């Protein structure tokens, strides 16, 4: 019984300050949940993807700035209308679905439309992943801007197979991001495998490296959380999903007798790697290595390893760092002609490293019912942290083909 304002034993006492803090914490949690589920920047992604398509695809095609490898792919699409089979009669190191797209579009405006749709899808799933993992929509928007600028420059005139594969790569990552954010929910891994299979038939080697990176992310996270059984289930579910897509499409190469040629052509860039006998090694190391440093890859790699992060972000950094380093090594050891667009293969890994570099906001009390989270700009940190050298790299990659052709 309460007499003269005194509380009986067992009845909790909540001073005004504690009640006020509890209300604020509840409001902050509600605001964070609402932030994660609303405000998809549809119009921004639509415009950015259109801009990137025009810069990376339309402008090089109109002015004859397409890379030799990409021009060969366009020629293959035209030649398939005349006669012959891909892989048997014409060389191709990309996937079967990619050459089907080239065949259907014949290098016309339809291919640019397909690239636009692919870039829109990539931006959609990238934003979804960033929002799921961090809940910081402002920095996720800045990540989209950096991503599209990098695609426009690194994909200028070539590596379109990687670009059209990115929505499937980022869709697979978005499903894994859902699991990393909420380990209780590990559904959707069948779709992870199916999405990676579709990406494989567009751009095989980058997809295999990205799949390896995702596997390392899950392995590291499951070890940290002691979820070994879940890891086995995820592996077999992903493998089943991959098989559902791989075998029906791959069966076409068996029927046409091009299976062996398809494997050899796909692995040709890897089979011809050289160290001591590679006359282009020094040029490759200087060109790709310098661009990698100027783009800030060293900073991203070091920060991904050194800075303390939650388990989910640290797991992402392990896979992304390994995928990035292996991709750079393949470029340096390659005997293929130098071209800036070949660096587009690093984009999926570089984007993930940028994603985990988000800074946590510092909450400040604005009123009894609101809190505003102020976070530093991802765009400014990326540029200032690398002394604005990424701007130099972007301008260089955009104007180098122009100077090489017309001057």
Language-model features, listed with the residues they occupy:
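Aromatic- and kink-enriched transmembrane "portal" helix at the membrane-lumen/periplasm boundary
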Residues: 99, 108, 145-167, 201, ...
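Membrane-interface alpha helices of multi-pass inner-membrane proteins
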Residues: 188-204, 210, 215, 325-333
């Amino acid at each position: 019984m309460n007499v003269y304002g005194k509380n009986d034993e067992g009845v909790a006492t909540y001073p005004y300050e504690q009640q006020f803090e509890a209300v604020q914490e509840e409001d902050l949690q509600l605001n964070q949940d609402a932030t994660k589920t609303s405000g998809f920047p549809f119009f921004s992604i639509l415009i950015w993807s259109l801009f990137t398509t025009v810069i990376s695809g339309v402008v090089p095609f109109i002015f004859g700035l397409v890379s030799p490898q990409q021009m060969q792919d366009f020629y293959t699409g035209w030649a398939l209308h005349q006669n012959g089979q891909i892989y048997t009669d014409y060389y191709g190191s990309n996937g079967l679905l990619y050459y089907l797209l080239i065949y259907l579009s014949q290098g016309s405006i339809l291919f640019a439309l397909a690239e636009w749709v692919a870039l829109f899808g990539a931006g959609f799933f990238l934003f979804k992943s960033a929002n799921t993992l961090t809940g910081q929509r402002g920095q996720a928007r800045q990540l989209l801007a950096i991503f599209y600028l990098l695609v426009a420059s690194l994909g200028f005139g070539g590596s379109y197979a990687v670009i059209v594969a990115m929505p499937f790569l980022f869709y697979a990552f978005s499903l894994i991001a859902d699991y990393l954010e909420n380990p209780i929910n590990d559904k959707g891994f069948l779709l992870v495998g199916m999405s990676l299979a579709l990406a494989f038939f567009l751009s095989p080697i980058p997809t295999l490296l990205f799949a390896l990176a995702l596997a390392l992310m899950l392995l590291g996270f499951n070890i940290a959380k002691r979820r070994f059984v879940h890891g086995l289930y995820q592996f077999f579910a992903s493998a089943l999903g991959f098989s559902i897509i791989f075998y029906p499409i791959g069966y076409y190469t068996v029927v046409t007798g091009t299976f062996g040629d398809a494997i050899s052509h796909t692995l040709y860039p890897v089979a011809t790697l050289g160290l001591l006998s590679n006359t282009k090694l020094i040029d490759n190391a200087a060109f790709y290595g310098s661009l990698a440093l100027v783009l800030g890859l060293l900073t991203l790699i070091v920060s991904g390893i050194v800075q303390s992060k939650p388990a989910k972000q640290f797991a992402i950094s392990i896979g992304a760092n390994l995928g990035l380093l292996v991709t750079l090594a393949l470029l340096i050891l390659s005997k293929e002609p130098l071209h800036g667009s070949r660096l587009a293969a690093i984009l999926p890994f570089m984007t993930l490293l940028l994603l985990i570099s988000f800074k946590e906001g510092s909450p400040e009390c604005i009123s009894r019912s609101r809190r505003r989270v102020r976070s530093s700009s991802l765009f400014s940190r990326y540029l200032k942290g690398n002394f604005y050298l990424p701007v130099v790299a972007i301008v260089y990659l955009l104007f180098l083909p122009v100077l090489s052709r017309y001057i």
